[in-house]
């Protein structure tokens, strides 16, 4: 079923993130998280003749939202949809003959569509197959991880990607339960892990559990790293990077690249002790959703927007 863009995903920090791009005439812009098309639609509304927008999304469901954007003929000519993981940003820009870009926007995390889809296993609210793939054409599933990973590897991803303090005990219980069952649905997982979560924190901890599996399934941190490094190379001097994150792992990586120019956050200095970084921070403090937006869209509560501008070569 084709959904409207608004139903698919309500764009978070829409005005703030688009203003952060500082869009100008004849610019080339990239939205690496098309989703419901909300951010892309707003960018297109500000583009003029000679400008172009490339929008990425690896999910076939997202591509259907193009028809709901109501684009004019001029906007269609200025728009290219790329059905691909954004980790391949550099390759696709080379394919389209784009040497430099003037701005890149990323609204990271999972769209409302994925959380609310009762068939793909992204949420513990529904009984569904343990899939969690953004790209349904390839890759391992959450069920594969739960059934095949050894205890140590499983514990590591729960700790690193879910920040679960009981990761070792939970992993041990998951592996032990394999003797009685094969993990196929979300309920198969929940019956194993529920005893480890206090009722007061049950929903938060379950969300962290599902987050850890989703990140591993989709190689999200590796993809984000590759995209940010590519963006650093592709942005021309004065170009803007506008990124919305939803959890601490994403935010730390984005913060590091903007402040130091590398994923590790290692500060480099020149001969005179001056800090060398390719970016100038546009906002020193993260931008968060207003109280009004949080009331209208509860999923915006954890959103953090960071904006940086590529420096001129010195």
Model-derived features: positions:
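S-adenosyl-L-methionine-dependent methyltransferase catalytic core, i.e., the SAM/SAH-binding region
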Residues: 1-314
